[in-house]
């Protein structure tokens, strides 16, 4: 391993000069270690990543942690390979940083743990699976109206407090319980408090044993925030490629990945592009997203929380992400106010899998009829608000009558929320979901009260709930 010396420090950007014609490759990791020699100094153990070559002997690097205490002239060792992180079953139930060091309170992983580099090529064409397979989540509104594809990419939109985290936890739980699947969670540039809460909530609900967690939070340098998504993805890829698993990969928040890339780009002196973003925005996003896919041995399905700056969907950051998405799940605050959980907007959420050749004719027809009924109800709400229900035609009254039952039946209790609600969570198989909505739309349950449809799983539970309320089916 060749050693060089630090020649310049500009915040998170560090220049390192090497002798004897040695120049580390782009993406190589460089380690700076220094023992404190006096009380005024601090121990330093810093990892840098090569970003640029400057001339014949100097590299410009991005620091993965704070550069406080680093001085010119300090020794830097080229490790000869990219940053590598632990992979495999040893990562389950644990929390890591961008470098793969555990940041939970348990024992560190031993040196025998297998480690993989975070930079790698996307699977080649001959490795990709050509089958489009639906990933059943057990969540009615998702499975019926915006189904997820195995190996697909799903965008999760929602403001603060509308249930993104609970939806993520339920997906992790359902995949673990029903499919025996594994999840990897990457916290990219979000609040440390939220990561802490998520960890303890997952511990309480028992989901943590099937999950690996990686965090590079808001307070960390841009290098860590930019690379932590790749750290999580590398762990997920190992479960897919080596263990043949169907993996769920969560990124919260993909916008912060772009934001960190923009900061790094500016620090490296690149000319900014549209709205001040990095000129390499599309390339960086593509390199990450192309690795998330189904292969012949397994799949990585990603669910990405997306922050939309100033609600501007034409902003280059979210717009670049949209190009890669197969489905969107939009969470709507108005639905939480009505007590409908999960608060997924059935009209705004989309999926390219909702096509008759993928989901089947019956599923497609029922889903479209549900959307048409809800859309008509939405159009009638203004008339109802001004004139009242009595002014509607008999046909429109029937639409409203059924739409409200459909809307309430799209809600259900979650397993991970049992400790808060006291209600047992429900996993609803896709066949049962389609059957339930088909019967509601046919008018079979028009005589049952609306509240019987609220927060239940299968259609049989509606009948039981109505009986408890004194109404016979």
Swiss-Prot record:
Matching entries from CDD domains are given as:
ATP-synt_F1_beta_C, ATP-synt_F1_beta_N, F1-ATPase_beta_CD
Tell me what this protein is called: ATP synthase subunit beta
Q: Which Gene3D superfamilies match?
A: 2.40.10.170, Bovine Mitochondrial F1-atpase, Atp Synthase Beta Chain, Chain D, domain 3 (1.10.1140.10), P-loop containing nucleotide triphosphate hydrolases (3.40.50.300)
Positions that bind ATP: 158-165
A Pfam family that the UniProt record links to this protein: ATP-synt_ab
Q: Name one GO molecular function term.
A: ATP hydrolysis activity
Q: Which SMART domains match?
A: AAA
Enzyme nomenclature, EC number: 7.1.2.2
Gene Ontology cellular-component annotations: plasma membrane; proton-transporting ATP synthase complex
Q: Which InterPro entries match?
A: AAA+_ATPase (IPR003593), ATP-synt_VA_C (IPR055190), ATP_synth_F1_bsu (IPR005722), ATPase_a/bsu_AS (IPR020003), ATPase_alpha/beta_chains (IPR050053), ATPase_F1/V1/A1_a/bsu_N (IPR004100), ATPase_F1/V1/A1_a/bsu_N_sf (IPR036121), ATPase_F1/V1/A1_a/bsu_nucl-bd (IPR000194)
Does the keyword Membrane feature in the UniProt annotation? yes
